[in-house]
């Protein structure tokens, strides 16, 4: 496969850095982190943005962005948005689609499972570490992995394909389909769809052959 060119790197950075934080941060408690991104999505010209969204057809991007835009109609800290984030990603009740890869790929369906350890080992071997205090989540949280994807495209582009093929694409579509189905608020339904379509489009562009594991959930 070809070396990542500057355009592809910039597009990957955009996708990962735009979508990743939306999975990681509570719209109310972490507003200072995500408010700019949420406000940008709330004021978006959906049709124009869809034409420019990387790795996704304009029609598919428009459908997903319209859902996200609709979900922000009552504001970036609306009760519906905040409580849906907490239902999906925080708890205390069981999460309908847990955001960690090993929950799906480990036979015991646990966090910090075998695939998490494989990712951690890959990061260690390549001298990559998540800054302390940035996240308490396992490394295979979907948001953490999207942010890491953006960082790799910017700082270590030679590792992007391997990271995608061996660690992210192995489970991302499976999880994101479940999240899209579980979402009861249009913002997160659209987020799940747009993220899945973006990663699948990136996989196609990079011509990556992924060995999918058995899913236990």
Q: Whereabouts are the PLM-identified features?
A:
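Charged, alpha-helix-forming regions
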Residues: 1-217
């Amino acid at each position: 496969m070809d070396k990542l060119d500057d355009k592809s790197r910039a597009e990957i950075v955009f996708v990962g850095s735009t979508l990743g934080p939306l999975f990681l941060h509570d719209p109310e408690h972490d507003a200072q982190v995500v408010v700019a991104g949420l406000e940008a999505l709330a004021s978006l010209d959906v049709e124009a943005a869809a034409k420019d969204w990387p790795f996704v057809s304009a029609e598919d991007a428009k459908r997903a962005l319209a859902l996200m835009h609709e979900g922000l109609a009552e504001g970036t800290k609306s009760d519906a948005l905040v409580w849906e984030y907490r239902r999906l990603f925080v708890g205390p009740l069981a999460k309908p689609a847990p955001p960690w890869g090993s929950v799906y790929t480990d036979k015991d369906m646990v966090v910090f499972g075998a695939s998490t350890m494989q990712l951690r080992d890959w990061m260690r071997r390549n001298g990559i570490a998540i800054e302390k205090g940035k996240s308490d989540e396992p490394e295979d949280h979907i948001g953490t992995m999207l942010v890491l994807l953006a960082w790799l495209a910017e700082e270590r582009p030679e590792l992007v394909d391997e990271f995608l093929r061996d660690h992210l694409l192995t489970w991302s579509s499976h999880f994101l389909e479940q999240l899209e189905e579980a979402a009861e608020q249009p913002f997160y339904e659209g987020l799940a769809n747009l993220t899945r379509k973006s990663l699948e489009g990136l996989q196609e562009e990079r011509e990556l052959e992924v060995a999918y594991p058995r899913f236990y959930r």
